Swiss-Prot record:
Underlying gene: Ctsr
Domain of life: Eukaryota
Organism of origin: Mus musculus (Mouse)
Principal localisation: other
Protein name: Cathepsin R
Any GO MF annotation of the entry: cysteine-type peptidase activity
Propeptide: 18-114
Keyword ATP-binding: no
Transmembrane segments: none
C-alpha cells in the first residue's frame, strides 16, 4: 500500500506542475544523464526525472527479489530510463501470430534426431557485432539482415554486414513502414523479389526513413526463398542447431524486457499470441546442470551493447513458447 501511495504522490506532483523528487538520487541522475548523453529543458527534466526515479525504484526492488531467489534475471537502468510507457510502445511493432504465413516450405524435425545441448553461432563467426537501431523502429530489418548474413557465408565464405537501411527504405511496397515498423516476412519478400541486398558499406544505416537507393551493382546477398517455421520450440531448436541464426518475433512490450541486464528472462505477463519486436535467435543452452527451468534461447537484440548481456538476452526456453519465441520464426534459403 505504501508503494502505491508513493507513486500516486509522484504523479500528483507531475499533474500539479511540481514534481516530487528524491534529492538523494541527484548524483545518480547526473551520472546517468552524462552516460547516455541526455539533455532536457528545465520543465522537461523534472518530468523525465519523475519517470526515471520510478523506474529506478522498480529495478532495485526487482533485483532485491532476485537476490532472494524470487526471479531468475536482473535488471539495470539503461538509456530507456526516462521513457514513458507511450514512448516505449512507439518502439514496438505488433503482429498477431494468426497472420503467420508460409514461406517457401515448412521445416520438420526428423524423429529421433539428436541435437547438441549448446549452440552459439557467434563462436563460429556467423554473427555480426551488435548494433543500435536508435529511434528508428527497424528491429525487423536487423533480424532479417542477421539471418541472411549467416546463410550467405555458405556461399561466400565470409561474414559481410548487410544493409538494414536498404530494407528500411525499399521494402514499403511489400507492406513495411520503414522506421514506423515492419514485418520480417515482408522484408524477406523484398529481398527475394528484388534480387538482392546491398552491404552496410555501400548503403549505411542512418536510422531514419529515406528514398530507396538500391543499386543492383552493389548487391552482396541474394536469397532463393525463405522458410516459415511451425509454432514449435522443438522445431525452432532443430533449425537453430542445423540451419543457423533464425529470425523471430517476441513480445517485448514489458518494462522487465526493456531493463533486462542478465540471467534467464521469464516474464509472467508475456504473450505468445502477439509479437511486438524482431530479434535473431543465435543459439540456445542451459544454466548449471541440465534440469527443467534453466534452459534458454540466446537472442541478439538491436538496442546496442549497453542493453542486456552486451546486446544479447537469455530467454526462457521450453516454457510454453515463452513470449512467442517460436510463433513467428523464419530463415532464408540461399
Amino acid at each position: 500500500m505504501a508503494a502505491v501511495v508513493f507513486i500516486a504522490f509522484l504523479y500528483l506532483g507531475v499533474a500539479s506542475g511540481v514534481p516530487v523528487l528524491d534529492s538523494s538520487l541527484d548524483a545518480e541522475w547526473q551520472d546517468w544523464k552524462i552516460k547516455y548523453n541526455k539533455s532536457y529543458s528545465l520543465k522537461e527534466e523534472k518530468l523525465k526525472r519523475v519517470v526515471w526515479e520510478e523506474k529506478l525504484k522498480m529495478i532495485k526492488l526487482h533485483n532485491r527479489e532476485n537476490s532472494l531467489g524470487k526471479n531468475g534475471f536482473t535488471m539495470k537502468m539503461n538509456e530507456f530510463g526516462d521513457q514513458t510507457d507511450e514512448e516505449f510502445r512507439k518502439m514496438m511493432i505488433e503482429i498477431s501470430v494468426w497472420t503467420h504465413r508460409e514461406g517457401k516450405s515448412i521445416m520438420k524435425r526428423e524423429a529421433g534426431s539428436i541435437l547438441p545441448k549448446f549452440v552459439d553461432w557467434r563462436k563460429k563467426g556467423y554473427v555480426t557485432p551488435v548494433r543500435r537501431q536508435g529511434d528508428c523502429d527497424a528491429c525487423w530489418a536487423f533480424a532479417v539482415t542477421g539471418a541472411i548474413e549467416a546463410q550467405a557465408i555458405w556461399q561466400t565464405g565470409k561474414l559481410t554486414p548487410l544493409s538494414v537501411q536498404n530494407l528500411v527504405d525499399c521494402s514499403k511496397p511489400q507492406g513495411n513502414n520503414g522506421c514506423l515498423g515492419g514485418d520480417t516476412y515482408n522484408a524477406f519478400q523484398y529481398v527475394l523479389h528484388n534480387g538482392g541486398l546491398e552491404s552496410e558499406a555501400t548503403y549505411p544505416y542512418e536510422g531514419k526513413d529515406g528514398p530507396c537507393r538500391y543499386n543492383p551493382k552493389n548487391s552482396k546477398a541474394e536469397i532463393t526463398g525463405f522458410v516459415s517455421l511451425p509454432q514449435s520450440e522443438d522445431i525452432l531448436m532443430a533449425a537453430v542447431a542445423t540451419i543457423g541464426p533464425i529470425t523471430a518475433g517476441i513480445d517485448a512490450s514489458h518494462e522487465s524486457f526493456k531493463n533486462y541486464k542478465g540471467g534467464i528472462y521469464h516474464e509472467p505477463n508475456c504473450s505468445s499470441d502477439t509479437v511486438t519486436h524482431g530479434v535473431l535467435v543465435v543459439g540456445y543452452g542451459f544454466k548449471g546442470i541440465e534440469t527443467d527451468g534453466n534452459h534458454y534461447w540466446l537472442i541478439k537484440n538491436s538496442w546496442g551493447k549497453r542493453w542486456g548481456i552486451r546486446g544479447y538476452m537469455k530467454l526462457a526456453k521450453d516454457k510454453n513458447n515463452h513470449c512467442g519465441i517460436a510463433s513467428y520464426a523464419h530463415y532464408p534459403t540461399i
